[in-house]
Regions:
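Basic nucleic-acid-binding alpha-helical/helix-turn surface characteristic of O6-alkylguanine DNA
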Residues: 1-108, 157-164, 170-180
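Short glycine/serine-rich loop segments
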Residues: 109-151
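Conserved segment of winged-helix/HTH DNA-binding domains
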Residues: 154
Length: 180
C-alpha cells in the first residue's frame, strides 16, 4: 500500500509518499519526474514516517539537523539504488562532481548514466542529489529546479563548517526572492 500527503515547506509545496514502513518519495510540486497520486494510493497525513519527516525537515531548515534519520525505500534499478546510496555519503554542506560520484561507485566511465540516476532520485533532499555539481563547479541538473538547488546548498553551507558568515545573509535574501 502506498500512502501520500502534501506539506508546505520553505521552498514550496511538497508531496511525500511511503509504504507501511518507510519513505518512498519526497517531491517538490512541479519538479521533473514528480510522482502523481494514483487511485490505489491512500491519502493519510499522520503516519509515523510523515510525522518524523516533517519534524526533521523543520530542524533541517532551522540549521539544527544535517543528517536525516528516516527509514528509506526508494524504488529503482539496482544501479540507481547504488547511486542513491552513494549520495547519502556526501556530507551536509559539501558537494561532489558527477565524475567523482561515478568514481566512488566504480563507474568512472559512466558519468552520464550516474547523472541520469541522480536525476531520477525519488527522495529529493533526504537523499541529497542537490549536492552533486558539474565538473567545473557549476550548478547543473536538479529535478526540483536550480533555484531550489542553490537555496539548499546555501542553507547547508550556512549551518556547517563548510560555509562562511556571509552565507546567512545570502540564504535569507534568497528565501525572500524565492517567495515572490
Amino acid at each position: 500500500m502506498t500512502y501520500y500527503t502534501y506539506t508546505e515547506g520553505p521552498l514550496g509545496r511538497m508531496l511525500f509518499t511511503a509504504d507501511t514502513q518507510a519513505l518512498t518519495g519526497v517531491y517538490f510540486i512541479g519538479q521533473k519526474y514528480e510522482a502523481k497520486p494514483r487511485p490505489d494510493w491512500v491519502e493519510e497525513d499522520h503516519i509515523p514516517v510523515f510525522t518524523a519527516l516533517r519534524g526533521q525537515l523543520a530542524r533541517y531548515f532551522k540549521g539544527e539537523l544535517s543528517t536525516f534519520d528516516l527509514p528509506l525505500a526508494p524504488r529503482g534499478t539496482p544501479f540507481q539504488q547504488r547511486v542513491w546510496e552513494a549520495l547519502l555519503q556526501i556530507e551536509c554542506g559539501a558537494t561532489m562532481t558527477y565524475g567523482k560520484l561515478a568514481d566512488s561507485i566504480g563507474y568512472s566511465s559512466s558519468v552520464r548514466a550516474v547523472g541520469a540516476a541522480v536525476g531520477r532520485n525519488p527522495i529529493t533532499l533526504i537523499i541529497p542529489c542537490h549536492r552533486v555539481i558539474g565538473a567545473d563547479g557549476s550548478l547543473t541538473g536538479y529535478a526540483g529546479g536550480l533555484e531550489r538547488k542553490r537555496a539548499l546548498l546555501l542553507i547547508e553551507k550556512t549551518h556547517t563548517n563548510h560555509g562562511d558568515t556571509k552565507s546567512t545573509e545570502d540564504t535569507e535574501q534568497f528565501k525572500l526572492e524565492f517567495a515572490r
